[in-house]
Swiss-Prot record:
Keywords from the UniProt entry: Cell inner membrane, Cell membrane, Coiled coil, Cytoplasm, Membrane
Gene3D superfamilies, sorted: HflD-like
GO cellular component: cytoplasm; plasma membrane
Gene: hflD
Subcellular location(s) per record: Cytoplasm; Cell inner membrane
Coiled coil: 79-122
Protein name: High frequency lysogenization protein HflD homolog
């Protein structure tokens, strides 16, 4: 059966978008608010109509992730910011594989996400309450699966409880995207052997987005 590289690229961009948000938060203490909203919402939408539906039904919602994916696929250096993004992306993939083989953790994750949906009736998606709840899910359900993702950035910035919560919530969104990536036929070997296919697909999607003004 032929791989659907459109869906695979969208899901992979979702992982990369989360990685980029983590990087922005860790270095600057803030991040692209629209991209964060899209990524956080992907965790809560349990019944999307399509791969694109997970990310709000618009390719433009993944612009940050698509641009990050191209940087990761074409990174010539193992140092610096692209190396950080590659490490976060690969680490999320490893954790997702551990999650997929831990039935108890999967069940707990589903229950906790249902709890988030109830909280959304009373709190905004980017409120401190929801952010802390998502961070708590990451700490309680995902982190124990190991290995832990080492987030690097500004020590002063990373001391902030609000930044820590947003980082963990973004990592949870990355796990969601990694689950989706496997569901649509993604696999780590593609990063080695299908780089050109993924790069071409990402460029094609970005080409029909309206330029940012």
């Amino acid at each position: 059966m032929a791989k659907n590289y459109y869906d695979i690229t969208l899901a992979l961009s979702g992982i990369c978008q989360s990685a980029r948000l983590v990087q922005q938060l860790a270095h600057q203490g803030h991040c692209d608010a629209d991209a964060l909203h899209v990524s956080l919402n992907s965790v809560i939408d349990m019944n999307p109509s399509s791969t694109l539906g997970v990310f709000g039904g618009s390719e433009a919602n993944l612009r940050l992730g698509l641009e990050t994916l191209l940087g990761v696929l074409n990174a010539s250096s193992r140092q610096g910011l692209n190396a950080e993004l590659t490490r976060y992306t690969l680490s999320l993939m490893v954790l997702e594989r551990k999650l997929s083989s831990a039935k108890g953790a999967l069940n707990t994750l589903g229950d906790r996400i249902n709890g988030l949906q109830r909280q959304l009736d009373h709190f905004d998606l980017q409120s401190d309450t929801l952010m802390s709840a998502m961070a708590g899910i990451y700490v309680d359900v995902i982190s124990p699966l190991g290995p832990r993702i080492q987030v690097t950035g500004s020590p002063a910035v990373l001391q902030s409880p609000q930044v820590q919560a947003k980082v963990r919530a973004s990592l949870l969104a990355g796990i969601r995207a990694a689950v989706l990536w496997h569901q649509v036929g993604g696999g780590r070997l593609q990063l080695m052997f299908s780089r050109h296919r993924l790069t071409t697909q990402a460029k094609q999607i970005l080409a029909h987005l309206t330029p940012e003004l």
